[in-house]
Swiss-Prot record:
It comes from Campylobacter hominis (strain ATCC BAA-381 / DSM 21671 / CCUG 45161 / LMG 19568 / NCTC 13146 / CH001A). It catalyses: GTP + H2O = GDP + phosphate + H(+). Belongs to the TRAFAC class translation factor GTPase superfamily. Classic translation factor GTPase family. LepA subfamily. Transmembrane segments: none annotated. GO terms for molecular function: GTP binding; GTPase activity; ribosome binding; translation elongation factor activity. One of its GO terms (biological process) is positive regulation of translation. It is a peripheral membrane protein. Its EC number is 3.6.5.n1. The keyword Hydrolase applies. This is Elongation factor 4. Pfam families: EFG_C (PF00679), GTP_EFTU (PF00009), GTP_EFTU_D2 (PF03144), LepA_C (PF06421).
Length: 596
């Protein structure tokens, strides 16, 4: 058992994490050469297309050194800030982590965030400089950055190129020498944590577990502490990205997949503890946090009869991604749909794309919002994540909104642009540090609502793509906020309501009605688009009526005849205006997102 090493790879996006995982897999011959593909750990199409890792994957590698066989359990983690929950979950199951930093780009914001998670779990961290084959690689500068920003000693940092294979053997040997073997307790009652679960069409719900104490065998009867249910172990496997390898038992310190033949993944929820039903452990494994949704949006099917299909699709996705939450909601404008909670904007995009792609649905997503705390005059406190749920202003004593702590690393030449952007988003500066003469670390406290829309795009365009950004929720602070409603043809469109700071409401209202005017199709009657706060209209635009030339068939003749026809048309339009309905195209709901 002292020959086992459990480790993760942590890095910022695009620093070569998945390529390094590929290289380790091929070096240890875990996947046959003919089955090897680039990004072999990234199994979803979206992951390969976008070049990002979304779902943490595991693989068991075997390596011989000094005539001893070692088992290396590699857990590949996502780099993007939205998926940091996947990272912390993976790191909780390891004893060590490889910190990959691009030797040309240096330390980035998400590198810092993920390293701190590893330090919290007391992991042995091995710094690795990747892409040293690039002509602009500067390993010494990057080592200094790691020491200055993160405070990890880089004298033994390993220089590799995942692309060409330089330094990979040194890295594997360093993993074996420097990462401690797991503490094992084979004689104690079984205690294993479920740190991932997903759904397989043939085998049902699968649980990826890390065994801390004892052993689990095929045909054992296990007891899941969270659900208090008993199940028989039908099969045990070691993880491999191509096809898992079957085994009879998984011992203390090892990682493996348990097949219990369950139809529902909620029966094997992530973070739960598995033990034997006839020899139970006393306490579950603690210190495991559930993912908390951070951003909420309404998701509606464009064809209203597809509501049940959407429910099934969300149920199936939740099997693979326990961090989404959803509840049914109705909207006057969009019909039946769900209010879905996500970990961040990229997560929202990915989930929406997976729903459309894997389940053949056409969906509309409303503007994302956060959870607000509403303190009422009668002493009650409500939490809302849909602006249309906001009570009347007269009943509200104060509104608190969530803040996030943002870390940004940028080249010094773009500092002015960034500070302007952060100030316009109501950011409060807490730290500014020159890492080197031309790179700056900024830390800001900023309302979460200001960063979930298009902040990332603006940050990238203002710094020509060089700045990196990371955020974590901190706490709630009081804000001067009000609800802005949009009326089309005199009717409130609930899906377009947003909560905004009072001093930005007027400008936001004007921008919104202007954008809507371009999108709402012209009708046979004039359509008014208005922005209102309570009963007060603050901005208005009109979509002009389409004119039908009713006098076309009057040749010459009497002007009174023409006038009569025009009057009749006017009457008809008036009547139409009072009872007419306007169908809004789905772009209208997206236009809200685009407004700065």
């Amino acid at each position: 058992m002292e020959n086992i090493r459990n480790f993760s790879i942590i890095a910022h996006i695009d620093h070569g994490k998945s390529t390094l995982a590929d290289r380790l897999i091929s070096e240890c011959n875990a996947v046959e050469d003919r089955q090897m593909s680039s990004q072999v750990m990234d199994t979803m199409d979206i992951e390969r297309e976008r070049g990002i890792t979304i779902k943490a994957q595991s693989v068991r590698l075997e390596y011989k050194m000094n005539d001893k066989k070692y088992i290396l359990n590699l857990i590949d983690t996502p780099g993007h800030v939205d998926f940091s929950y996947e990272v912390s979950r993976s790191l909780a199951s390891c004893e060590g982590a490889i910190l990959v930093v691009d030797a040309s780009q240096g330390v980035q914001a998400q590198t810092i965030a993920n390293v701190y998670i590893a330090i919290e779990h007391n992991l042995e961290i091995i710094p690795v400089l990747n892409k040293i084959d690039l002509p602009n690689a500067d390993p010494d500068r990057v080592k200094n950055e790691i020491e200055h920003i993160i405070g990890i000693d880089c004298t033994d940092a390993i220089e590799v190129s995942a692309k060409t294979g330089i330094g990979i053997k040194d890295l594997i040997e360093a993993i074996i020498k420097r990462i401690p073997a797991p503490k094992i307790e084979p004689k104690k009652p079984l205690k294993a944590i479920i740190y991932d679960s997903w759904f397989d069409n043939y085998l049902g719900a699968l649980a990826l577990i890390r065994v801390y104490d004892g052993e689990i065998h095929k045909n054992d009867e296990v007891f899941i502490m969270g659900t208090e249910k008993k199940h028989i172990v039908l099969d045990l496997m070691y993880p491999n990205p191509i096809s898992p390898i079957k085994t009879e038992k998984i011992s203390s310190g090892e990682i493996g997949i348990v097949v219990l033949g369950l139809k529902n993944v909620s029966d094997v929820s992530v973070g739960d503890t598995i033990t034997l039903s006839n020899n139970k452990a006393n306490t579950p494994i603690g210190g495991f946090e559930r993912a908390k949704p951070f951003v909420f949006a309404g998701i509606y099917p464009i064809e209203t009869d597809k509501f049940e299909d959407l429910r099934d699709a969300l149920n199936k996705l939740k099997l693979n991604d326990s961090s989404i939450s959803y509840e049914p909601e109705t909207s006057l404008a969009l019909g039946f749909g769900f209010r879905v909670g996500f970990l961040g904007l990229l997560h929202m995009e990915v989930i929406k794309e997976r729903l459309e792609r894997e389940f053949n649905l056409n969906l509309i997503a409303t503007a994302p919002t956060v959870t607000y705390e509403i303190y009422l005059t009668n002493g009650e406190m409500l939490k809302i994540h849909n602006p249309s749920e906001l009570p009347p202003i007269s009943n509200i004593q104060m509104i608190k909104e969530p803040y996030s702590h943002a870390t940004i690393i940028t080249p010094a030449e773009f500092l002015g642009n960034l500070i302007t952007l952060l100030n316009s988003r109501r950011g409060i500066q807490t730290k500014m540090d020159y890492i080197t003469s031309d790179r700056v670390l900024l830390e800001y406290d900023i309302p979460t609502n200001e960063i979930i829309m298009d902040f990332y795009d603006k940050l990238k365009s203002g710094t020509k793509g060089y700045a990196s950004f990371d955020y974590e929720p901190i706490d709630y602070k009081q804000g001067d906020l009000i609800k802005l409603d949009i009326k089309v043809a005199g009717e409130n469109v609930d899906a377009l309501s947003i909560i905004v700071p009072r001093d930005k409401a007027l400008q936001k209202g004007r921008d919104l009605v202007k954008a809507m005017k371009e999108i709402v199709p012209r009708q046979l009657f004039e359509v008014a688009i208005q922005a209102s706060i309570g009963n007060k209209i603050i901005a208005r635009e009109n979509v002009r009526a389409m004119g039908k030339n009713v006098t076309a068939k009057c040749y010459g003749g009497d002007i009174t005849r023409k006038r009569k026809l025009l009057e009749k048309q006017k009457e008809g339009k008036k009547r139409m205006k009072s009872i007419g309905k306007v169908n809004l195209p789905s772009e209208a709901f997206l236009s809200v997102l685009k407004i700065d």
